[in-house]
């Protein structure tokens, strides 16, 4: 039966809102760690930022296998193939486990590469202490991502939301106790933050594993029954679909990191303004990312069921919803820049006025790249739903690194546009990515006959 556009929109909202909420909660978890370490000490804050960034970069690369579980399981559900549902999920967890274990030596010797990146000796030493503990969390963090993908593909996004919200609260309590040494706990500084992170990741995995494996409505999938048995065909499919997803995420993170580094060359006020404007843009981006995850599931279900009409109509609705939200954020960024920036600043401090003045310009540019950023992440979600990841990886690489970063550099330092030039480069790179990826999806999407 043909679905109306309204029914597609409702289905996307039901699936997508909890995912959006879980992404925002995950951001809140990282922000709370930053706030606590910032109150403990400047060096510790620097360690938390650089250590957290190192962990995140490795996580992004490895998360591709976990993210590949979502479209594969969704397509299997669309085909009513329960055997493949559990096999894809298991092999996604196998690959996540293997990647997490293989990367731990990198964290064990992190002092050497932190020094190589130009960090001060004290920051590098404490950074290694942090990562030697937090690095053990890579395995549960990736397994959690795989289980979230599995549950999202089955439409069980509410549990993902509430588990993530619970993790934020538990992390804050443990981190506060161990960083500052309150309630009878030892004062451990950055090591306390690492222990809190590891504990919460492990606890979240246990909660989701129990839910996914033993909830009566899901028990018939037998997710953990004979978990040790390999399925080489399913493992190969997850691997082939997943590694380009991880590389694409790494390249996008690299684009924004490179712009941040270049902004630091310009000045401290400019870098601070950039950081705040980027935080505001990131909050808005979480909505588009949640919609992208939801549309991956919906597209996978339609593709598995062989329903080209539902697939294409669902894509149109997702694009329209993302554009509508993007236009709302454009209006807010242009109408209330000072109010938005003030949320992140103590306006009593003298330097805040300079940051707000410069940040207002950057928020106007953030309004420009909102739609491009939204369209490229929605297109990536649609392409993953039809299991197309390798060509999109190369398209993203071209857009981010051959177009975005060079344009940013030339406009900023050859045409003397400074930070404005850097952000214009982001606008151009993301717009090119959006155009190429959308063209790829509509070229590859099944035709209605």
Segments and roles (model prediction):
Residues 3-35, 39-40, 53-68, 72, ...:
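N-terminal transmembrane alpha-helices
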Residues 14-33, 133, 144, 167, ...:
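Transmembrane helical elements of multi-pass membrane transporters/channels
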Residues 47-104, 108, 141-160, 273-336, ...:
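Small-residue-rich hydrophobic transmembrane alpha-helices
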């Amino acid at each position: 039966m043909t679905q109306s556009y309204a029914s597609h929109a409702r289905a996307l909202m039901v699936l997508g809102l909890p995912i959006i909420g879980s992404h925002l909660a995950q951001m809140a978890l990282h922000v709370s760690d930053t706030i606590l370490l910032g109150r403990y000490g400047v060096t510790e804050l620097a360690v938390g930022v650089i250590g957290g960034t190192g962990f995140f970069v490795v996580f992004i690369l490895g998360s591709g296998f976990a993210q590949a579980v979502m479209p594969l399981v969704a397509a299997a559900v669309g085909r009513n193939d329960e055997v493949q549902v559990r096999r894809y999920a298991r092999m996604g967890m196998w690959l996540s486990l293997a990647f997490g274990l293989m990367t731990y030596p990198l964290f064990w010797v992190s002092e050497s590469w932190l020094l190589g990146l130009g960090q001060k000796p004290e920051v590098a030493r404490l950074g290694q202490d942090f990562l030697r503990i937090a690095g053990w969390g890579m395995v549960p963090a990736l397994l959690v991502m795989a289980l979230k993908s599995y549950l999202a593909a089955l439409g069980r996004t509410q549990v993902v939301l509430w588990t993530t919200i619970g993790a934020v609260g538990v992390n804050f309590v443990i981190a506060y106790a161990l960083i500052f040494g309150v309630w009878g706990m030892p004062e451990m500084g950055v090591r306390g933050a690492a222990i809190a992170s590891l504990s919460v990741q492990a606890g979240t995995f246990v909660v989701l594993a129990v839910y996914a494996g033993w909830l009566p409505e899901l028990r018939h999938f037998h997710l953990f029954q004979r978990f040790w048995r390999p399925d080489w065909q399913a493992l190969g499919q997850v691997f082939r679909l997943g590694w380009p997803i991880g590389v694409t995420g790494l390249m996008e993170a690299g684009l924004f990191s490179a712009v941040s580094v270049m902004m630091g060359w310009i000045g401290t006020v400019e870098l601070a303004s950039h950081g705040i404007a980027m935080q505001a843009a990131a909050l808005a981006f979480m909505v588009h990312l949640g919609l992208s995850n939801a549309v991956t599931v919906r597209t996978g279900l339609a593709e598995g069921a062989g329903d080209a009409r539902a697939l294409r109509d669902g894509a149109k609705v997702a694009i329209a919803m993302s554009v509508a939200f993007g236009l709302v954020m454009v209006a807010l960024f242009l109408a209330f820049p000072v109010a938005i920036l003030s949320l992140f600043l103590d306006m009593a401090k003298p330097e805040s006025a300079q940051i707000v003045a410069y940040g207002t310009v950057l928020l106007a540019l953030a309004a420009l790249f909102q739609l491009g950023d939204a369209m490229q992440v929605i297109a990536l979600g649609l392409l993953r739903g039809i299991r197309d990841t390798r060509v999109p990886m190369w398209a993203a690489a071209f857009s981010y690194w051959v177009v975005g970063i060079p344009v940013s550099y030339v406009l900023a330092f050859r045409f003397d546009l400074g930070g404005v030039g850097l952000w214009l480069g982001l606008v151009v790179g993301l717009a090119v990515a959006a155009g190429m990826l959308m063209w790829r999806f509509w070229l590859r999407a099944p035709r209605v006959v």
